[in-house]
Amino acid sequence: MSKSLKKKSHWTSKVHESVIGRNPEGQLGFELKGGAENGQFPYLGEVKPGKVAYESGSKLVSEELLLEVNETPVAGLTIRDVLAVIKHCKDPLRLKCVKQGGIVDKDLRHYLNLRFQKGSVDHELQQIIRDNLYLRTVPCTTRPHKEGEVPGVDYIFITVEDFMELEKSGALLESGTYEDNYYGTPKPPAEPAPLLLNVTDQILPGATPSAEGKRKRNKSVTNMEKASIEPPEEEEEERPVVNGNGVVITPESSEHEDKSAGASGETPSQPYPAPVYSQPEELKDQMDDTKSTKPEENEDSDPLPDNWEMAYTEKGEVYFIDHNTKTTSWLDPRLAKKAKPAEECKENELPYGWEKIDDPIYGTYYVDHINRRTQFENPVLEAKRKLQQHNMPHTELGTKPLQAPGFREKPLFTRDASQLKGTFLSTTLKKSNMGFGFTIIGGDEPDEFLQVKSVIPDGPAAQDGKMETGDVIVYINEVCVLGHTHADVVKLFQSVPIGQSVNLVLCRGYPLPFDPEDPANSMVPPLAIMERPPPVMVNGRHNYETYLEYISRTSQSVPDITDRPPHSLHSMPADGQLDGTYPPPVHDDNVSVASSGATQAELMTLTIVKGAKGFGFTIADSPTGQRVKQILDIQGCPGLCEGDLIVEINQQNVQNLSHTEVVDILKDCPVGSETSLIIHRGGFFSPWKTPKPMVDRWENQGSPQTSLSAPAVPQSLPFPPALHRSSFPDSTEAFDPRKPDPYELYEKSRAIYESRQQVPPRTSFRMDSSGPDYKELDVHLRRMESGFGFRILGGDEPGQPILIGAVIAMGSADRDGRLHPGDELVYVDGIPVAGKTHRYVIDLMHHAARNGQVNLTVRRKVLCGGEPCPENGRSPGSVSTHHSSPRSDYATYANSNHAAPSNNASPPEGFASHSLQTSDVIIHRKENEGFGFVIISSLNRPESGATITVPHKIGRIIDGSPADRCAKLKVGDRILAVNGQSIINMPHADIVKLIKDAGLSVTLRIIPQEELNNPTSAPSSEKQSPMAQQHSPLAQQHSPLAQPSPATPNSPVAQPAPPQPLQLQGHENSYRSEVKARQDVKPDIRQPPFTDYRQPPLDYRQPPGGDYSQPSPLDYRQHSPDTRQYPLSDYRQPQDFDYFTVDMEKGAKGFGFSIRGGREYKMDLYVLRLAEDGPAIRNGRMRVGDQIIEINGESTRDMTHARAIELIKSGGRRVRLLLKRGTGQVPEYGMVPSSLSMCMKSDKHGSPYFYLLGHPKDTTNPTPGALPLPPPQACRK
């Protein structure tokens, strides 16, 4: 906010704070008097000597005005409400008081009728008082009643005589005229009326009276002309403030700012932040340097539109609040009616929505507030140049009425492709260095099409010649994107590597929602009129009139929707998350939808990274919980929509929490870390409850049933095409596996389930001696709020098995305990799924999610001796977090050997029968060195289409280390035991500790790599580090990052391998990526998020090219952030432990990040901190804990800290970093990276992580406004 520069001492300099607690009697030791019901500020009465428990601050003095209680402004509240605030505050209480005198005394009416400069502390305090008054009072007016207004709620309608009587009696705190009618603000009653009691009794500290349903300040009352009193001499000596644009804000404009919302013309009286009662002089001087949207000289001569309000930022910049849409904008809406096309503007004026910035560093540039972009070229000159250069055919733009850019009526939206009206066409585009050569618009709302905004000349789309402006994007590589968000589709396109192609299905016939020829709306030059080759013919047709006609003639670019339910159009890529949610748009795993359907209420899991200014969205209270009120940063909140109900935050249910408690939880989330949200969208939501009949059935059953009665199928024929089996052995129901109707079959399977509830549970299985033994289990799961709690793999091609992927910790499947990763899914609610596609299974789970339960039949290989598998599918000591593991390609289901686990060091039973040789390797080390090898532990994910085998293997051998010298250990060797103790089911951390305690020698029982007959599981170079592999041709061949991933499970990172049967699988052409350490992350706590939609708009007015935070969401001409991309089906952000490139431009005070580590400190280099509002945090990709792999193209392996600083400095104003996604936790000095647990002490690679050596070496790359982080060695030059 802008504050006046004062020559004399202002009353705010006398404000003091007292911190007190309740005394042993539970009392505060002072009386409270005054209150709005008496027309007074609340003030201190008798202060009882010796009864006040002071903790700090000054003493309380009788008769002083009470301004705040624990930062909650109380001026304008009744005594009852002030006491309620104090009652709900926990000790200690922080009271801000001021001595009466000058303009502030106990008389509210006197203070409210003073006239102050807009943006001053006094003006803000007046607004706070009015906000608080309207909690308890209703304005009165002499004007006639309007339609839709409720007497006694919107206004008290009285006669002129009654109004004059109230005025004479002193019952009005404010009064005046507006449009020849009298308006007044009566004193609130001491006890609230029943109408207002329920709403305002919930005022708690921190929950300012901004909840929906509170009293609102009326436009007429706010804008009424009052006989305002000039403030006394103390305030007359304040100098008017120049608002950064040369426009002096005069006191006469102070009262014309609040507008209304609702039938009666009212505005939600969101309270202003508590005034800052003291201000350093250096901050006061900053006001003259601010930049803002320049209001017209006569801006106050025209009223703002209804429900709009003018406000000021802390720097004095003008912005506008639209209470209709609950959004903020830098644009003055009054100027919209005066808008004209850019080409008609004079050279010394700018089009509507544009602003000129003169920056001392970057020079002059222009801000387009409509499209939120910046450019160096004058938009008027640009428009005139384009008009002449392109010979635009629609020159009649200048004859259009003067209005805001011509937005057209939004077409009727549909998620059903068959309902689209227009002609369909398909095209295939190959990604080039400039992207796909077109820009898109739309998708900012759930019911908005994504359309081609422009085609870039000479780009792939222009060269193809088929795409045109306005085309609706329907399918991208068989993924229907109708209803997808803009950010999702952008990420999908960005995930395609350069040189790869995508198939697009477009629908032509929908106009853009704006005039594409209007330069004010253009992100790129308008599409040039050019000769195009005739479109490619598909099956002899150029286009098709209807979508059904189109898909009936071609099946190459879109899936067949004729044999699936309509909702299957919303299918996602393979690998399903069967928890009833859509996949998180920015989460790291490629998962398919298994929600309740696009047209039904649905639960979604989103992952949002908190920035320096919060999460970028606001929340509001509602009868069903906290809902998303406004999206302030669309790019920062991908997948989130206004109106979404927040169900969980980081696995904590928040439905029954108050607004304040949810805000506090969001505040506690650290900056730069991922926060997981489960939100509910659509429908009327209440926590899921099982219907009574279902509860009765569950209770009658006693315990969950396990049916293991079906004959096992030999592995040589794992998926017989004619395999048929009913849901229960006694059932005679049959289903056609060729083309089942999921709806009909679901009803049948439900009837089967209900018919068997009287049958006692049975557990039996039969074995077929002709092949490996299997057993089938029936698993009944009830859907929790987070879903069924497991994921699905496979089914990418017909005939591939459908497998259970990761079992989510604390989910429904995990609590049930019977479902294991690697189980083959045979039936879903009695419907056979063997050989079916992934999408088909996901569709079945949609129906199950809607009904709250599912019956699954899974097939599991039987262990030797017929011993059952462990129930939990994980080792006991595993740590469970929700970071994601690296990508894993689906491995072909192949023949596998199997053996039972062993509890001792002897070879597991069954190894000899398969000619697998184990050997003992003894490694000796010296005192000053480590053993020199790295252990990699797999997670609880299926491998080769079955279970995880020996989960621990050698991932790296250090040159010259004891492990290297013994010449008996190779990369890829599986470790069975350490010093005679089996580690198959041991958590990774325990293995490290076991080796640590081994002393100077350790004995490893291993299965050599060559015995596994699995050459693809490890690189042939046995000493090549995983890190270095990324830069070698071999690594490009075998690296998970370089391979397409048709199916990707989402496994909790820290979860070690489950106690699965010991099986040695052969899996040709399968590429695995393994997690290499624990992920026990606990980042720092930082800044709170936004909770008020009236916050100023996000400042996107950075100089062009000055902030490479993210590629423009509307332009695909950006290079992919890293050439090692994932396949198209995986279009979310890089996953944990992925490699990615960050380019940054240096800010005024540096790059805004600090680093830790270096060779001299025996650790790799990591990102230590991100300075608030610095280039690094604005970039959005770098996070705390990321490992720095390269600096300006130079590898950081064995790099010293000083060399890293030198490289950053040598890059000048730009730096290019290759980073490896970390865990959010920075390793302590003397620790090896948390992503690698090394058993060594070599000089090159550091000491074991369990020793603490040396001192930290943290280097800061500061940014403006950030305190330097020690030591002050900054990357600034």
From Swiss-Prot:
Claim: Translocase is one of the keywords in the record: no
Role according to the record: Seems to act as scaffold molecule at synaptic junctions by assembling neurotransmitter receptors and cell adhesion proteins. Plays a role in nerve growth factor (NGF)-induced recruitment of RAPGEF2 to late endosomes and neurite outgrowth. May play a role in regulating activin-mediated signaling in neuronal cells. Enhances the ability of PTEN to suppress AKT1 activation. Plays a role in receptor-mediated clathrin-dependent endocytosis which is required for ciliogenesis.
Sequence positions bearing Phosphotyrosine: 362, 827
Recorded GO CC terms: bicellular tight junction; cell-cell junction; centriole; centrosome; ciliary base; cytoplasm; dendrite; extrinsic component of postsynaptic membrane
Topology of this chain in the membrane: Peripheral membrane protein
Name of the gene encoding the protein in the UniProt record: Magi2
Family to which the UniProt record says this protein belongs: Belongs to the MAGUK family.
Subunit structure: Interacts (via its WW domains) with DRPLA. Interacts with CTNNB1, ACVR2A, SMAD2 and SMAD3. Part of a complex consisting of MAGI2/ARIP1, ACVR2A, ACVR1B and SMAD3. May interact with HTR2A and IGSF9. Interacts with HTR4. Interacts (via guanylate kinase domain) with DLGAP1. Interacts (via PDZ domains) with GRIN2A, GRID2 and NLGN1. Interacts with CTNND2. Interacts with MAGUIN-1. Interacts (via its second PDZ domain) with PTEN (via unphosphorylated C-terminus); this interaction diminishes the degradation rate of PTEN.
Subcellular location: Cytoplasm; Late endosome; Synapse, Synaptosome; Cell membrane
Biased composition (Polar residues): 1011-1042
Protein name according to UniProt: Membrane-associated guanylate kinase, WW and PDZ domain-containing protein 2
Pfam entry (one): MAGI_u1
Xref: InterPro entries: GK/Ca_channel_bsu, Guanylate_kin-like_dom, Guanylate_kinase_CS, P-loop_NTPase, PDZ, PDZ_sf, WW_dom, WW_dom_sf
Regions of compositional bias (Basic and acidic residues) in chain numbering: 281-296, 1069-1085
GO molecular function: activin receptor binding; beta-1 adrenergic receptor binding; kinesin binding; phosphatase binding; protein-containing complex binding; signaling receptor complex adaptor activity; SMAD binding; structural constituent of postsynaptic density
Region (Interaction with DDN): 302-381
Keywords, ordered alphabetically: Cell membrane, Cell projection, Cytoplasm, Cytoskeleton, Endocytosis, Endosome, Membrane, Neurogenesis, Phosphoprotein, Repeat, Synapse, Synaptosome
Residues with the Phosphoserine modification: 686, 884-885
GO biological process, any: neuroligin clustering involved in postsynaptic membrane assembly
Leader sequence segment: none
Record region (Disordered): 205-308, 556-575, 869-913, 1011-1130
